Amino acid sequence: MSETATAYKLFRCLQCGFEYDEAIGWPDDGIEPGTRWDEIPEDWSCPDCGAAKVDFEMVEVDR
């Protein structure tokens, strides 16, 4: 498997700046570490401000 296929991504809320890291997940909402952004339900919202999932953008990070 290539590094690109396994690299985890980071998504930032455009409303408040909250960051969802696929490597960490969000256990408070039952989202296990390693959960890909596409696997999160469409009705999930930002835990900090309540913004919709569509209000997040992928952030380029060096790991």
Curated annotation (Swiss-Prot):
Instruction: Give an example GO biological process.
Output: alkane catabolic process
Q: Which Pfam families match?
A: Rubredoxin
Cofactor(s) the protein needs: Fe(3+)
Q: Where does Fe cation bind?
A: 13, 16, 46, 49
Keywords assigned by UniProt?
A: Electron transport, Iron, Metal-binding, Transport
Task: Quote the record's cofactor note.
Answer: Binds 1 Fe(3+) ion per subunit.
Q: Which residues form a coiled coil?
A: none
Domain Rubredoxin-like, which positions?
Answer: 8-59
Q: Which GO terms describe its molecular function?
A: electron transfer activity; iron ion binding
At the top level of its lineage, which domain of life is listed?
A: Bacteria
What SUPFAM superfamilies does this protein map onto?
Rubredoxin-like
Membrane-crossing residue ranges in chain numbering: none
Keyword Protein biosynthesis in the entry? The reply is no
Query: Which family is this protein grouped under?
Result: Belongs to the rubredoxin family.
Concerning PANTHER family, the annotation shows: RUBREDOXIN, RUBREDOXIN-1-RELATED
Question: What protein is this chain from?
Answer: Rubredoxin-2
Provide the species name: Rhodococcus erythropolis (Arthrobacter picolinophilus)
